[in-house]
Each structure stands twice: as structure tokens, then as C-alpha cells.
């Protein structure tokens, strides 16, 4: 069973013990729109630094190379390059027994990090990371900035205030874009291996915040939940976009877009072999269907201001609402 990283962490100063301690913010949000329960607890047993293996990289200091294992903690206020992280998730996500991993603090930077199975990189507000590679079973809890993260089966959880640019999602990796976060220039190569509109919500890109300029390739899937917005998305053959929230300026170059009940899609362009499906309760506005593209509007669906070009196809139920123009003029 796939493990789901859904915990953000920060360090706070404990005036009683005179040490930094770990605070975890548990935000349980399994796919398909489950509710969120937030709890805050101090794990005093994880005082930092408490073990000889725990290290602090001070501001202005640069450290290169090394491996974190066996619940080691690395607290980064300076710069760390080329670290391998293999600890932090041994007991699974949302488990207070987890004590290890890398903590990139305000002003800290971590570059070219490798996160293996059981490893966790935490990027707190004001921290930044680049060129991180995360394997299956590893994760990144992001409250700061991340550039060019590669998820090779790993997970990236974006908490409020986080910005992720250039994430590539491969091999059942998972990026969760929570409310108050922005993911830009993401490339999605996984999530739709089960076929078009298959029921899975824990691989690919899961959007409850803002996703901008996403590219969805073969086998890729973007799920836009009710509170989410996807802007300027390109979907290629074998990939799909599932919309329960808002999708703006999507281009279907052979890919599929499913607009579900409560979802809205505006200014979609359907090119050759692309397919926009507007389901019961879904709404599409200003769709352009080019040659060999296809628009399907199911019973109870709505598509307005459709532009149907020569060679494009429109398939609709008599119980759907459809208006637009084609080469013969207006239709409704």
C-alpha cells in the first residue's frame, strides 16, 4: 500500500529545556476530497540537537555530501549540497515516532539532495531546495520553495505558503498542491496508467491550490479538486485532466479532459484526437473544437459558446445544454 506523506513540521524553541523541539502539523487529506483534520503537538523527545549524530549547519556555512540514517537530524540554516536522506519516515507518515531527516530552515538552502525510501526532507517557511530527487517511500514536506524536484515514486506535499517550480512526477509519484500553494511548470508522467478517468487519486498531481503551466504526458493525470484551479494546462495523448474545480485555458493535444459535477472548464482547445467530456453537472464555456477533436456533453452537462470547426465532432445528449457556432451558423 502506498504511504502518504501529509505532515508538515517546524522547529520551536522550548524555554523549559532550552532546546529546539519538533512540532508536527498533521493534515489528513487522503485523495478524492477527504476532510482535513489538523492537530499540533510538541514531540519533546525529539529535541534537536539531542544525539551526537544530529548536526546543525549554521548560516554562512556550506556542507557537501553525507548521508542521514537511523533517525539522524540535519538542521540547515546555511547551505547543504549533495546530501542523501534515508531517515525520517521509518514509522510511516503522521507518526510521532519519526525523528530524523533534513530540516531546511528560514534562510537555509539544500541542493542536489537524494531522498530514498524512508527518507524525509522538510522545507520550512523561508527555506529553499533545488534539484531534489525523491524515490518511492520517500517524501518532501514543503512550506518554503522547491525548484526542479523529481518524484521517482516519491511524494511532495505542499503546505500553505509553499511554491514548487519544475516538479517532474514519474513512476507513481504524487504531488499534492494544497490550498494556499502554487505549483508551476509541473510535468506529470504518471497517474493514468489505469486508463482514462480511472479511479485513483494518490498518484500524479492532486490540486487543491493553484497549478500553472502544467504539462500532462502519456499516463499522466491531474486531478483538480473543488477548491483547486488549473491554469494553462497542456494534455497529450494518453494523459488526462479530471476537473471538479476550475480549469482555465486547457489545450488537449490528444489528451482527455473530464469535467465533473461542480467543475468548470473555460477556454479549452480540443485538437486532433483530443476529447472533452462534460458530465452531469459539469460546465464548459468557450470550448473550441478543431479538426478531429471531440466534445461530448452528457445528460445534465452544459457547454456554452462552443466553436465547432470543420472536421470537429460534437456528441451530445438531448438532456444536455449546448450552444455555439459552426460553419453553418449558430446552434443550440
PLM regions and their residue ranges:
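Long, low-complexity, polar and repeat-rich extracellular regions
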Residues: 1-332
Amino acid at each position: 500500500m502506498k504511504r502518504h506523506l501529509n505532515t508538515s513540521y517546524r522547529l520551536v524553541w522550548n524555554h523549559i529545556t532550552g532546546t529546539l523541539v519538533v512540532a508536527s502539523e498533521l493534515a489528513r487529506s487522503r485523495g478524492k476530497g477527504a476532510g482535513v483534520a489538523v492537530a499540533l503537538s510538541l514531540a519533546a523527545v525529539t529535541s534537536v540537537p539531542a544525539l551526537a549524530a544530529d548536526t546543525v549547519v549554521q548560516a554562512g556555512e556550506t556542507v557537501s555530501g553525507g548521508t542521514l540514517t537511523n533517525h539522524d537530524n540535519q538542521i540547515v540554516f546555511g547551505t547543504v549540497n549533495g546530501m542523501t536522506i534515508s531517515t525520517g519516515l521509518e514509522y510511516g507518515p503522521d507518526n510521532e515516532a519519526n525523528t530524523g531527516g533534513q530540516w531546511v530552515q528560514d534562510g537555509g538552502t539544500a541542493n542536489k539532495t537524494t531522498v530514498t525510501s524512508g527518507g524525509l526532507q522538510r522545507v520550512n517557511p523561508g527555506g529553499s531546495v533545488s534539484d531534489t530527487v525523491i524515490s518511492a517511500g520517500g517524501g518532501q514536506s514543503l512550506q518554503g520553495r522547491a525548484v526542479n524536484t523529481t518524484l521517482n515514486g516519491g511524494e511532495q506535499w505542499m503546505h500553505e505558503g509553499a511554491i514548487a517550480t519544475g516538479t517532474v512526477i514519474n513512476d507513481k509519484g504524487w504531488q499534492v498542491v494544497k490550498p494556499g500553494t502554487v505549483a508551476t511548470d509541473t510535468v506529470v508522467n504518471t497517474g493514468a496508467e489505469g486508463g482514462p478517468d480511472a479511479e485513483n487519486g494518490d498518484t500524479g498531481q492532486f490540486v487543491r491550490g493553484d497549478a500553472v503551466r502544467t504539462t500532462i504526458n502519456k499516463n499522466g493525470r491531474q486531478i483538480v479538486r473543488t477548491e483547486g484551479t488549473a491554469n494553462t494546462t497542456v494534455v497529450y495523448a494518453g494523459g488526462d485532466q479530471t476537473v471538479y474545480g476550475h480549469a482555465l485555458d486547457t489545450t488537449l493535444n490528444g489528451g482527455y479532459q473530464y469535467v465533473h459535477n461542480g467543475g468548470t472548464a473555460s477556454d479549452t482547445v480540443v485538437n486532433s484526437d483530443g476529447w472533452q467530456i462534460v458530465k452531469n453537472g459539469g460546465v464548459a464555456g468557450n470550448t473550441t473544437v478543431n479538426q478531429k477533436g471531440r466534445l461530448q456533453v452528457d445528460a445534465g452537462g452544459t457547454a456554452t459558446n462552443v466553436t465547432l470547426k470543420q472536421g470537429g465532432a460534437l456528441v451530445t445528449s438531448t438532456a444536455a445544454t449546448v450552444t455555439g457556432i459552426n460553419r453553418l451558423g449558430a446552434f443550440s
